[in-house]
Amino acid sequence: MDPVSHAEPSARIPASRVPEGRGPEGHVAAACVAAGRVLESEEPALPLGTAPLYASAPSPEDAANATTAAAVSGPRTFAVDCGGGGIKTALLDAAGTQIGPARRTPVRYPFSPAALENIIAADAAALRAEGCDFERLTVGMPGMLRHGVVVYTPHYIRRAGPHTRLDPEMEAAWNGLDIRAALAARFSRPTLVLNDAEVAAAATVTGRGLEVVLTFGTGLGNAIVDSGVLAPHLEFSHAPLRWGLTYDDVIGEIERIRLGDAAWSRQVARAIESLYPVIRWDTLYLGGGNAARITESVRERLSGSVVFIPNAAGMSGGVRAWDLVAASERARAEQ
């Protein structure tokens, strides 16, 4: 089995987005063909010690040459990162470099599978209007998924958003749905659907030892990769932590807002310390939108035991997720 190895670092330019229809080459269509620049998501800056997924921005000529070469060598991937509050999409070249700006659409509850399909379809149509297209689709979404089937998803089955009352109609619509098959049929493209933390893991893991990825956003996401093989998904977020509360209850976004970053960060540290005796990972990565909010004092407390990764890993992993899944399937077939 060939372990998944690091892709070449992607280039990145500042978050001042290219205006609609106006790139350095004159328009978005030209950028789709040749620019290959990565546009940062609007997230808090990560401090020193962050995993080096990105290098400094190349010259326009180098970026165009690199992206053109990548486009020839592999398919373009339309990556979809599904969160409790919004759906983000971006077009990636074969190297995982973002082409043009990402798009974000707020989730409006109740949120059905058809609503997700329609958001993806609208963003795909916008790409085509700009002269772009994709050959495959990668979707990362919260919850337990097996072989593209939703076993359980925590947010979209609620009436008014995370931690609100269950909506029986949405629960029936989502849980048990073969979302991979539904999206593949809708878009007529090869489709991969994984837990969102597993997509982030694909952008991050080295294939050496037991690697764990924890993502902090609306709730807690997680992925486990053993020597380049993706382990069956476990939902740490639903496990009891203390006083009958789950990890999501204690370190999710609602609790962060209630406590403030300092107290919330201390709870994150305690949660990580409670997980280590159970898993005893070789490397732990922390990501997601709220990882950047972990305070410096807690970072120092965790220093030497964790690596921070950019929130963009949830999107950029859309390319390497295919390699991670293929390597995992080969390894299991050889057992």
Q: Where are the regions that the model predicts?
A:
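Glycine-rich phosphate-binding loop and adjoining helix at the ATP-binding site
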Residues: 110-121, 125, 132-136, 145-203, ...
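Short glycine-rich, Thr/Ser-proximal phosphate-binding strand/loop in the N-terminal lobe
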Residues: 68, 72-115, 165, 229-257
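Short beta-strand scaffold segments in enzyme catalytic cores
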Residues: 87-91, 143, 202, 220-226
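Adenine-nucleotide phosphate-binding core of ATP-dependent small-molecule kinases
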Residues: 103, 108-135, 244-335
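Short glycine-aspartate micro-motif
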Residues: 77-81, 134-138, 211-215, 221, ...
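Anionic-ligand binding region
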Residues: 209-211, 219-239
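Conserved phosphate-binding catalytic cores of ATP/NTP-utilizing and phosphoryl-transfer enzymes
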Residues: 54-56, 61-74, 176-213, 321
